[in-house]
From Swiss-Prot:
It comes from Buchnera aphidicola subsp. Acyrthosiphon pisum (strain APS) (Acyrthosiphon pisum symbiotic bacterium). GO terms for cellular component: cytoplasm. The modification S-(dipyrrolylmethanemethyl)cysteine is found at residue 242. It comes from the Bacteria. It is an enzyme of class 2 (transferase). Pathway: Porphyrin-containing compound metabolism; protoporphyrin-IX biosynthesis; coproporphyrinogen-III from 5-aminolevulinate: step 2/4. Keywords: Porphyrin biosynthesis, Transferase. Its cofactor is dipyrromethane. The gene is hemC. The lineage of its organism: Bacteria, Pseudomonadati, Pseudomonadota, Gammaproteobacteria, Enterobacterales. Pfam families: Porphobil_deam, Porphobil_deamC. This is Porphobilinogen deaminase. Tetrapolymerization of the monopyrrole PBG into the hydroxymethylbilane pre-uroporphyrinogen in several discrete steps.
Length: 314
């Protein structure tokens, strides 16, 4: 049994704290006598709200300080939204467990319209996700996409102030904050393929901390882990971050895994899609194979062009 106080690093946002308390409850259900201390941290990404993530370095900005807390032994584990965790894990750290996934899909939130199809021509839709932007423009090129940053409550407040006709958010984030009533449409994956790992919570720790690894491995949800492992393999092969419009979504059912992947241009003019179906234990191989297929079909040119443009902005 782990006989020390378990220190949990977490972002300070309402959603991050809600997710951390969810994990805390799971841990205490297994080890009721364990003493737990939360270590709230403000990340670099939390402080920069006037620029899109694609222009300031990507989702890794939300985890860097949490990982530093682990490396400096100021925390024992860190809680992440899996969609924010880069596909290449920092050396000396590892992903201990992934909790059971919630709803992985995106949702439309609007005060006046019930679906994307109902949005009028010229409607302003708020999102700073290049992945969502790319797919939405392809489906509805007559809409206006406007940047939207901040935590979920802040984004909804901007919608309510009339700055947007609709906004797009992660469904599970709304569910966790008990804002399910604000969802007007859960967007099908065929229209908006989710981000890698979306809807799941990951637990990260030091690679050498064997005792923590052992007792927290019990929180791992194997089906979710298999699904997200396939998604992350796809993105890892593409060396992707949120600076690039990429989606990946795997579903495991009856020992078969169905993996879908997408690479697009930010303006929505080019979208490449593919899928694989295979045995549950071939998810990682499927992810690499699907990425290779899209790279050969034109994704390599899209990614190269985006990397060149980004290098000019640094």
């Amino acid at each position: 049994m782990y006989n020390k106080t378990l220190r949990i690093a977490t972002r300070k946002s309402p959603l991050a704290l809600k997710q951390t308390k969810y994990v805390q409850k799971k841990i205490l259900s297994l080890y009721p006598d364990l003493n737990i201390k939360l270590v709230p941290i403000v990340t670099h990404g939390d402080n920069i709200l006037n620029k899109s993530l694609s222009k300031i370095g990507g989702k890794g900005l939300f985890i860097k300080e949490l990982e530093l807390a682990l490396l400096e032994n100021k925390a024992d584990i860190a809680i992440h939204s899996m969609k924010d965790l880069p596909v290449k894990i920092t050396k000396e750290l590892c992903l201990v467990s992934i909790c059971k996934r919630g709803n992985a899909l995106d949702s439309l939130v609007s005060n006046n319209y019930q679906s994307i199809n109902q949005l009028p021509k010229g409607a302003i839709v708020g999102t700073s996700s290049l992945r969502r932007q790319c797919q939405l423009i392809t489906y509805r090129p007559d809409l206006i996409i406007s940047p939207l940053r901040g935590n979920i409550e802040t984004r909804i407040a901007k919608l309510d102030q009339g700055k947007y006709d609709a906004i797009i958010l992660a469904t599970e984030g709304l569910n966790r904050l008990r804002l399910k009533n604000r969802i007007t449409q859960i967007i099908p994956a065929e229209l908006s393929l989710p981000s890698c790992g979306q809807g799941a919570i990951g637990i990260q720790s030091r690679l050498h901390d064997k005792k923590v690894l052992f007792f927290l491995s019990r929180l791992n949800h194997i089906n979710t882990f298999i699904e997200i492992n396939a998604e992350r393999a796809f993105c890892r092969k593409l060396e992707s971050g949120c600076q690039i419009p990429i989606g990946s979504y795997a579903i495991l059912k009856k020992n078969k895994i169905w993996l879908r992947g997408l690479v697009g241009s930010p303006n929505g003019k080019i979208i490449l899609k593919g899928e694989r179906i295979g045995c549950y234990n071939t998810g990682e191989k499927m992810g690499y194979s699907l990425a290779d297929e899209l790279l050969k079909n034109g994704a390599k040119n899209i990614l190269n062009n985006l990397h060149i443009k980004q290098s000019y902005c640094i």
